[in-house]
């Protein structure tokens, strides 16, 4: 028993991370391939970190944003909640895969079959939600709200998160005090 080394797990042959990135980048940056995700802004941050550069990923669709346009504040827009609400499916919880508290591990330490099941379920139910929500955009006459207003905000909000924003603290404090009085 060695207290100072990483636990040994059976090795499963895998492609090198750099090799996978080299294969996937052309797919993600191709303008002829539609990318469908849930909370895709998170994925854009990850891809930028992995590739070491800002990468334009278009065309894209985001089921979290679709849900927001169609449902507003009726309920949350997380994948787990939407899968349960619209597809009557309980998703595998991240904590079931990675643990919690002192037993929590990072996703790269998860057994390959568990990681595969978790990721495949996310992809599967994201696509199912897309197939459910996209026709509703047309039926509810919300296409322009989604395509012209909310979907473009994905990249704008990502840039704001990357760069930060300037805030006039005096004005913010005054607004806060005003809101507090009105509440």
Identify the function of each model-found stretch.
Residues 135-138, 142, 164-165:
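Short, flexible helix-adjacent loops and helix caps
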Residues 98, 143-144:
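Short, flexible segments with low predicted structural confidence
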Residues 1-138, 149-157:
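Active-site-proximal helix-loop-helix substrate-binding element of RNase H-like nuclease domains
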Residues 145-183:
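Extended, well-ordered alpha-helical scaffold/bundle regions in very large, multi-domain proteins
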